[in-house]
Amino acid sequence: MIKKRYLVISDLQIPYHHEQAVKNLIKLVKREKFDLVLNTGDELDMQSQSRWAQGTKLEWEGTLDADRNLAQNILYDLGTTDVTRSNHTDRLYNTLLRAPSLIGLPELEYSKFMDFAGLGIRFHKKPFEFHRGWVLVHGDEGSMNSNA
């Protein structure tokens, strides 16, 4: 039987990530050569798109492009192969609900917004079985807490 090696990373919350921890993860990835590097979502915080930012100066922060670029660079450096949807990735769509005429623009679909195809990353909108009996899913899936 062939053994596979997986690294599962959760909730980077870029740009609020712990920089040294991410640097250490990148070193680990380069050293250990995992078969898959899986991310459980919340890779990009998107705080200015959160419902908590509405009506505050945070909503006008204007750092989304820089935050996205940083997230793309980190995901690339980590060798990320798969990302699953999460409550933070849903923030882009939830923001579009306030401007419904923009819904359907391909570049505003989260996976295209993040250019996952260009980064070689597969995006999963539903739980993803990466190994028989093992599923990649964000913690808010099936949560009984409506704030998750």
What are these regions (language model features)?
Residues 2, 9, 14-117:
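Core catalytic region of metal-dependent phosphoesterases/phosphodiesterases
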Residues 4-14, 133-141:
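Active-site-proximal beta-strand elements of phosphoester/diester hydrolases
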Residues 7, 82, 121-125:
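General small-molecule cofactor/ligand-binding pocket signal
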Residues 93-148:
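Acidic, His/Gly-enriched loop-helix segments that form or flank divalent-metal centers
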